[in-house]
Amino acid sequence: MTPSSVTLNCSNCSHVLAPELNTVKAVVLGMVLGIFILFGVIGNILVILSVVCHRHLQTVTYYFIVNLAVADLLLSSTVLPFSAIFEILDRWVFGRVFCNIWAAVDVLCCTASIMSLCVISVDRYIGVSYPLRYPAIMTKRRALLAVMLLWVLSVIISIGPLFGWKEPAPEDETVCKITEEPGYAIFSAVGSFYLPLAIILAMYCRVYVVAQKESRGLKEGQKIEKSDSEQVILRMHRGNTTVSEDEALRSRTHFALRLLKFSREKKAAKTLGIVVGCFVLCWLPFFLVLPIGSIFPAYRPSDTVFKITFWLGYFNSCINPIIYLCSNQEFKKAFQSLLGVHCLRMTPRAHHHHLSVGQSQTQGHSLTISLDSKGAPCRLSPSSSVALSRTPSSRDSREWRVFSGGPINSGPGPTEAGRAKVAKLCNKSLHRTCCCILRARTPTQDPAPLGDLPTIKIHQLSLSEKGESV
C-alpha cells in the first residue's frame, strides 16, 4: 500500500494517521533542544539568585533584570518543553484546550520579556541623563508599579485568542499553532514588539547622545580639576563652618560623585545595549514573518522558515544570562559565587570586616562607625577630613582614592579599627556613601600631611541616605 492510497482511504477519516517517527532525528533533536532548554532554565535561575543572594546587586536596575529573567524562566520552563515535544514528534499530542493555553502563555512570556527590555531602556536613560537624581526618580515603589503595568499589558495582549479572537481551529487536534488571524497578528506584533522596539531605540539613541555630551563635559571638568589641584577635599566641620567653604565642598564633591556615578551608569547601559541588540536580531525575523504571512497568504514562508524564526525568538531568552556573564563583572563574580555554593549576603568576612558609617544623631557632625563583626563603635572626630584624590595616571573613575586625615577613635581599643579592612563613609548632608578599603591609623597619631595619609580604594558609591549602591 502506497502513501497516496493511505491518504485516499483515510480522506473521510476524522483523524489523520500519525507520520512515522524518525528515531535518529528525534534523538538528536531532543538532545539539542533539551540542552537549549536546560541552559535557559539554569542561566535565568542564576541571574535571579545572583541578585537575591548579593545585597550590592539589589538595586532598581537589577530588579528590572530579575523581572526579565523571571519572564525568560517562565518561557523556558512552561512553554519550551512542550514546544520541543511538538517539534520532535512533529504533531501536537496534548489536546486542543491545552494548545490554546500553551499559545497564550507563549505570547504572555515573550511579551513580558520584550517589555522588560523596554522598561530597562527607560531606566538606563534616566540613569545616564540624571545620574545624581536617579535614586530619587527611580524609586522601588515606581519600579514595582512599572513591573505590574508591564505584566498587565502582557496579559491583555496574550488573552485575545482565548476569548475567540482567532481563526477557526482545525479539526485535526494534532495541529497546534499560534493564531494567524490578521487583526490579532497585527495587534500582537505592534503591542508585543514594534511599539516596545520604538521606545527602546529612542531611549538608547538618547542615551548615546547624552553619554557623548556628558563624557565631553566630564573630560573638560577633569582637566580643570587637574590644573587646579589633584585633590578633592571633603571636610567634616562643626556647625560654625562658613558658607563659602560649604559651597566649595559641595561643588567639588558634586563633580567627583557625578564622575563616578556616570561611569557606572555608562557601563550598565553598554551591557544592556548588547542585550537589546541580541533581542532585535532574535525577534525581528519572526515579527516580520508573522504579519506578512497573515495579511498576504501568498507570501507566507514555508513551515521550515517559520519554525526557524520561531525558535530564534526563543533563543533570545537563553542568551541573556551569557551576555550578563561576559560583559558584567558584578554578575560574573556573583555567578562564580553561586556555582561555588557560597551565597553572599555581605562582603566576605575571611579577610574583610564591613563597617557601616552613619551620621550621629546626637553628636553634631561626627560620624559613627560600627563594625559588623563585633559591633564595636569607632568615631571620626568633627575635625577629621576625608579627601578624594585621582592618581595622575588614571583614566577612569576606578583610580580615585580616598584619604582620611583625622583620628579614628575606637571604643574598645585601637586594635578594633586597625583590623578593619572595609568601611562605609556616610554624610547625609551631601547624600554620599563610600565603601572603601581602609588602612587604619592609631587614634593617638596627629593628622598627617595629605601626602602621607592612608589610602582607601573606593568599591561603591551611593547618593541616597539608605546607602543604595550605584
Swiss-Prot record:
Keywords: Cell membrane, Disulfide bond, G-protein coupled receptor, Glycoprotein, Lipoprotein, Membrane, Palmitate, Phosphoprotein, Receptor, Transducer, Transmembrane, Transmembrane helix
Signal peptide feature range: none
UniProt-recorded Gene Ontology molecular function terms: alpha1-adrenergic receptor activity
Cytoplasmic compartment spans: 52-64, 123-143, 206-271, 328-470
Annotated Gene Ontology cellular component terms: plasma membrane
Gene Ontology terms: biological process: adenylate cyclase-activating adrenergic receptor signaling pathway; cell-cell signaling; phospholipase C-activating G protein-coupled receptor signaling pathway; positive regulation of cytosolic calcium ion concentration; positive regulation of MAPK cascade
Chain positions carrying an annotated carbohydrate: 9, 12
Coiled coil regions in record: none
Main location class: membrane
Lipidation (S-palmitoyl cysteine): 343
Membrane-crossing segments per the record: 28-51, 65-88, 100-122, 144-167, 182-205, 272-295, 304-327
One Pfam entry name: 7tm_1
Topological category with respect to the lipid bilayer: Multi-pass membrane protein
UniProt topological domain (Extracellular) ranges: 1-27, 89-99, 168-181, 296-303
Record-linked InterPro entries: ADR_fam, GPCR_Rhodpsn, GPCR_Rhodpsn_7TM
Chain segments carrying region Disordered: 375-416
Disulfide bond annotation, renumbered to this chain: 99-176
Classification via Gene3D superfamilies: Rhodopsin 7-helix transmembrane proteins
Record's compositionally biased regions (Polar residues): 381-392
Localization of this protein: Cell membrane
Similarity comment: Belongs to the G-protein coupled receptor 1 family. Adrenergic receptor subfamily. ADRA1A sub-subfamily.
Protein role: This alpha-adrenergic receptor mediates its action by association with G proteins that activate a phosphatidylinositol-calcium second messenger system.
Protein name: Alpha-1A adrenergic receptor
Lineage, highest ranks first: Eukaryota, Metazoa, Chordata, Craniata, Vertebrata
